[in-house]
A protein has these predicted regions:
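Hydrophobic, aromatic-enriched alpha-helical segments typical of multi-pass transmembrane helices
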Residues: 1-201
Length: 201
């Protein structure tokens, strides 16, 4: 899938610049991250469609809540990436970037919304909806486990372990890479349960 692949690309690109200062590497990496977040919108839409398929009222409510949380987190990370891009364009060196970041983060609500709780919602929404899909056997049981592992790696290792975290998210989202058959057990075209059979990112 393109979205997690771009996160992987961001993580690898970031590791090539130990100074993390303004320049082509910073810009390229954050453009990849921005594109990844934008592409996660249809990913969450696909997960939502799978989770609510043949689900009861509670299942649909759960899927909708998880999707909204995931999209809110996606928005927060996108805003953060755009801020990073803008700072990179304006600053001449890393100290100048730090001063600009301080100015941005001095505004009330920016830190929790864009750098704190906001981005965490991406992980919460993704794990939540994958757990729901696994409970209904739409994906393998280890799909949400891979997402949890990816989240744990990101939390423990920070951005330096982003490539490993992205690879785990690749595994968790692999079911979405399968082409749906024309019909399935539900009797409706294109709505066969998706099983985890291969890892592709």
């Amino acid at each position: 899938m393109t979205a997690p692949l771009l996160i992987l690309a961001y993580g690898v690109i970031r590791l090539t610049d130990p100074d993390h200062g303004p320049g082509p590497v910073w810009t390229t990496g954050h453009l990849a991250l921005t594109a990844a977040m934008l592409l996660f919108v249809p990913v969450f839409a696909r997960l939502w469609a799978l989770a609510r398929q043949d689900a009861g009222r509670a299942g649909r409510l759960s899927a909708g809540t998880a999707t909204l949380l995931g999209l809110a987190g996606t928005l927060a990370v996108t805003v953060q990436a755009c801020i990073d891009l803008q700072v990179g364009f304006r600053a001449a060196d890393r100290p100048a970037m730090e001063r600009l970041f301080e100015q941005v983060q001095s505004h009330p609500g920016v830190v929790p919304a864009v750098y704190g709780v906001g981005p965490l919602l991406f992980y919460v929404g993704l794990v939540w909806i994958l757990v729901q899909l696994s409970a209904r056997r739409r994906v393998g049981f280890w799909s949400p486990l891979a997402a949890v592992a990816g989240t744990a790696v990101a939390a423990a290792g920070g951005l330096d372990l982003m490539p490993l975290s992205a690879a785990l998210f690749c595994a968790s989202l692999a079911p979405l890479t399968r082409r749906r058959p024309a019909g399935g057990p539900s009797g409706r075209a294109g709505e066969a349960p998706v099983r985890l059979t291969a890892v592709r990112w």
